[in-house]
Amino acid sequence: MSTSSSSRIAIEQNNKCVNSVAAALCPLSNCQFSGVVISAISDEQKLEFNSIYKSSCTLSCSYDSQGVLLRIMLDNDQGHVLKEYMISADTDAAQLGRRCYAVSLESDNLVLRFGSDKDQQLFRKVVENVKHLRPKSVFSQRTEESSASQYFQFYGYLSQQQNMMQDYVRTSTYQRAILGNSIDFQDKIVLDVGAGSGILSFFAVQAGAAKVYAIEASNMAQYAQQLVESNNVQHKISVIPGKIEEIELPEKVDVIISEPMGYMLYNERMLETYLHARKWLKPHGKMYPTHGDLHIAPFSDESLYSEQYNKANFWYQSAFHGVDLTTLHKEGMKEYFRQPIVDTFDIRICMAKSVRHVCDFLNDKEDDLHVIDIPLEFHILQTGICHGLAFWFDVEFSGSSQNVWLSTSPTAPLTHWYQVRCLLPMPIFIKQGQTLTGRVLLEANRRQSYDVTIDLHIEGTLISSSNTLDLKNPYFRYTGAPVQAPPGTNTQSPSEQYWTQMDTQGNRNSNSMLNGALTVNGMGDGGMDITHGLMHPH
């Protein structure tokens, strides 16, 4: 793909620190090593000295915006790349003797046996220069390399971008918020954080933006560039590959736009990246969205609880094909109840008004999102069994002309965020009028997610329940089936309601026929000529 001159200029202005590293590495970062035997270290820490490839390999090292790109090819087939890895400041590596070098690349632990001492020393310098001369970014410090690799690979697929773009509520709300506040974008400099396909950047241009810097760390950046060029807006939008924590911009911006929300608002930890981007925001600048509200409510759903409980009971079998599985029942139960449930539900399963926790994107600090401690107090509106807590979020775009809300509430049209429910392994029975107190503790981890701890207590009693869940490993339960009303919500006989409705419709049809009009499917707009007992629709 050819890169436009405007994009090339933007990339050249990127990251002064990275440029200094490139100069320091050159020519070390652009070299090849032939005759390398590559071995693997297994999870059992066993070293297999036989090559994992059918012959010795050639390693090609070339500078990349993220560090040094390592390509592996066979010596006798250098036109075909077997594997690509990124050597970054986070790469773990160690020298083994005079010719071997151990390196941990993504999920692979490799030992490289070079053909000469000199080759090993040169490769070691490449790795050490990347590690020593390039400081770890905030993103790298908080994120495991394997998690980051998986994350950016996921968002590098067009199909995943399509999934988000086809979320009509999401995409249309963003467009309306931006176009409805064109005064905030007209002739302004805009930063799009985690631009993906660049759709929000295009909205900013539609609203009159003078310049948009679209930052995207995944391979989607190349597709965004293609869209920019094919839509002839390369003079307006500059696509910059890289992470906002690691790039440099040529100027401050008036507005930051982004779609940084994950499940339960905070999952994927993209909000921290969004807040980090404020270092490029001019005083009194705008952020779209401006703040987010996480809603939390206790819920009752015996069906969901039984479903998860029965799954775990698979491990309660004492004669599964002649094998006793019961020793794993406790761990199986723990694993299933550590999974947040992603689906949707009727809000009438909620037993109290939701508690709202606000995240202010204009003023909160990145560190504020490392540990989020939310106190809870619910005044119970209906007697029943509390099976856990339900979560959803709303975000507001506070513009100069109008405020626009994007909601993932169960009362709003469904989005690709759905809602999230966290179960209690030990549900608690609670009565109307009682007060349920406690806390939700979200502790960030290096897998770009959170460990979620729930503690609930019925005030004035000794009854309590708790659970810790892994937000990185949710259970996607949504099937597309219509949401069912919770049991016990009918205040009249559904059967009688149905027949009453049918009787009413029948009476209406009879009256229509007497008046010379035929009602079809309850709509009386057909005329009838009964001269010879034949109906003739007009």
Swiss-Prot record:
Main location as per UniProt: cytoplasm
E.C. no: 2.1.1.319
Database matches in SUPFAM superfamilies: S-adenosyl-L-methionine-dependent methyltransferases (SSF53335)
Alphabetically ordered keywords of this record: Chromatin regulator, Cytoplasm, Methylation, Methyltransferase, Nucleus, S-adenosyl-L-methionine, Transcription, Transcription regulation, Transferase
List of residues that carry Asymmetric dimethylarginine: R508
Domain of life, source organism: Eukaryota
GO BP field: chromatin remodeling; peptidyl-arginine methylation, to asymmetrical-dimethyl arginine; positive regulation of ecdysone receptor signaling pathway; positive regulation of transcription by RNA polymerase II; regulation of DNA-templated transcription
First-tier enzyme category under EC: transferase
GO cellular component labels: cytoplasm; cytosol; histone methyltransferase complex; nucleus
Domain SAM-dependent MTase PRMT-type residues, every copy: 148-457
Localization per Swiss-Prot or TrEMBL: Cytoplasm; Nucleus
Residues where S-adenosyl-L-methionine binds: Q161, R170, G194, E216, E245, T273
Reaction equations catalysed: L-arginyl-[protein] + 2 S-adenosyl-L-methionine = N(omega),N(omega)-dimethyl-L-arginyl-[protein] + 2 S-adenosyl-L-homocysteine + 2 H(+)
GO MF annotation terms: histone H3R17 methyltransferase activity; histone H3R2 methyltransferase activity; histone H3R26 methyltransferase activity; protein-arginine omega-N asymmetric methyltransferase activity; protein-arginine omega-N monomethyltransferase activity
Quaternary structure and interacting proteins, as annotated: Homodimer.
Family: Belongs to the class I-like SAM-binding methyltransferase superfamily. Protein arginine N-methyltransferase family.
Function: Methylates (mono- and asymmetric dimethylation) the guanidino nitrogens of arginyl residues in proteins. May methylate histone H3 at 'Arg-17' and activate transcription via chromatin remodeling.
Name of the molecule in the record: Histone-arginine methyltransferase CARMER
Gene it is expressed from: Art4
